[in-house]
């Protein structure tokens, strides 16, 4: 893995841009550190002084209350100063370029920049312009590495392992940065990944991914330890990718009857936000096998771990 993407180390350029850049040791280090951070969240005083005096900037060019808030809580629990920078109403909306914004962040002395952008590759460009660490919080349809890390963390907490698990990812794989990040991370950690989607929502280059492809959800569910449902991203679509929402739900939605096909131990996951009644039924989303609420809580622990490791937090976390 290149030094510019390393989660661990002592170099100046330490970024988390893609799960494809993480080796097994890197990924396990994040998950193990997140486990310790989760214990902090369960303590009476849920704060550590490890990043006191550091500045974390949340630079969001796309709306995402859930992810931005998760990073903000994570940074504040580590005692970092947090600046929330929204593109709406800012200099960016008046024509300021990403490079201009990077120079502004440099002048502010940002130690870490958490970047979400509609353009794939934007965080990578930003990482070449700033001296602080850059965390990719989602770039276009490319990647969302901390979502994949929190998903893996959730699987390991519930099932005790990731190695050897059969994970099925269902839905709009074509437009899903969550799917891409999960595929690379889970393969690195030893899981077998199958994607299930309409042919129109399967990426052209998927033959180079470490996955199996199926178009038959019913055939795959009985063999799945984890099924991850993806939201259909209408905002990223410019053409008709499936006939109707009803047809999509009938073939690729996880309703109560389909959930019965899963093994007793199997988990149902969703990165959120959910479209209830389309890709997942409310009864399934709210069932005991669903991890949707846990994923939100685990997201804070994982993002604490990432910031702690990237910024070389002071002191041990017990």
Swiss-Prot record:
Annotated SUPFAM superfamilies: Aspartate/ornithine carbamoyltransferase
GO cellular component terms attached to this protein's record: cytosol
Pfam families documented for this protein: OTCace, OTCace_N
GO molecular function per UniProt: amino acid binding; aspartate carbamoyltransferase activity
Catalyses which reaction(s): carbamoyl phosphate + L-aspartate = N-carbamoyl-L-aspartate + phosphate + H(+)
PROSITE patterns in the record: CARBAMOYLTRANSFERASE
Coiled coil regions in record: none
Matching InterPro entries: Asp/Orn_carbamoyltranf_P-bd, Asp/Orn_carbamoylTrfase, Asp/Orn_carbamoylTrfase_sf, Asp_carbamoyltransf, Asp_carbamoyltransf_Asp/Orn-bd
Top EC class for this record: transferase
Binding site for carbamoyl phosphate: 66-67, 116, 144, 147, 272-273
GO BP term, example: 'de novo' UMP biosynthetic process
Pathway annotation: Pyrimidine metabolism; UMP biosynthesis via de novo pathway; (S)-dihydroorotate from bicarbonate: step 2/3
Residues involved in L-aspartate binding: 94, 177, 231
Enzyme Commission numbers on file: 2.1.3.2
Keyword vocabulary terms for this entry: Pyrimidine biosynthesis, Transferase
HAMAP family linked: Asp_carb_tr
Assembly and binders: Heterododecamer (2C3:3R2) of six catalytic PyrB chains organized as two trimers (C3), and six regulatory PyrI chains organized as three dimers (R2).
Family: Belongs to the aspartate/ornithine carbamoyltransferase superfamily. ATCase family.
Function of the protein: Catalyzes the condensation of carbamoyl phosphate and aspartate to form carbamoyl aspartate and inorganic phosphate, the committed step in the de novo pyrimidine nucleotide biosynthesis pathway.
This protein's name: Aspartate carbamoyltransferase catalytic subunit
Protein's gene: pyrB
């Amino acid at each position: 893995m290149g030094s510019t993407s390393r989660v661990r180390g002592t170099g100046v350029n330490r970024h988390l841009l893609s799960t494809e850049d993480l080796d097994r040791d890197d990924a396990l280090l994040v998950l193990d550190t997140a486990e310790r951070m989760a214990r902090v969240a369960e303590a009476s005083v849920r704060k550590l002084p490890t990043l006191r005096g550091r500045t974390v900037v949340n630079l969001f060019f796309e709306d995402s209350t859930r992810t931005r808030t998760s990073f903000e809580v994570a940074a504040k629990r580590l005692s970092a100063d947090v600046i929330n920078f929204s593109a709406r109403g800012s200099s960016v909306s008046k024509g300021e370029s990403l490079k201009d914004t990077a120079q502004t962040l440099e002048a502010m002395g940002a130690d870490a920049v958490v970047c979400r952008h509609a353009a794939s590759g934007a965080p990578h460009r930003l990482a070449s312009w700033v001296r602080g660490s850059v965390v990719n919080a989602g770039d276009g349809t490319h990647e969302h590495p901390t979502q994949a890390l929190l998903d893996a963390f959730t699987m390991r907490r519930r099932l005790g392992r990731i190695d050897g698990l059969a994970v099925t990812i269902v839905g709009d794989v074509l437009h899903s940065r969550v799917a891409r990040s999960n595929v690379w991370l889970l393969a690195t950690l030893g899981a077998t990944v199958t994607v299930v989607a309409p042919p129109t929502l399967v990426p052209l280059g998927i033959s180079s991914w470490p996955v199996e492809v199926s178009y038959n959800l019913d055939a795959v569910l009985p063999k799945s330890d984890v099924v991850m449902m993806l939201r259909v991203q209408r905002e990223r679509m410019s053409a008709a990718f499936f006939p109707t929402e009803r047809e999509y739900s009938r073939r690729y939605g996880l309703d109560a009857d389909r959930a019965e096909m899963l093994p007793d131990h199997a988990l149902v996951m969703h990165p959120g936000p959910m479209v209830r009644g389309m890709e997942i039924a409310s009864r399934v989303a709210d069932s005991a096998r669903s991890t949707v609420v846990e994923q939100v809580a685990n997201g804070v622990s994982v993002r604490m771990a990432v910031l702690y490791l990237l910024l070389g937090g002071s002191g041990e976390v017990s």
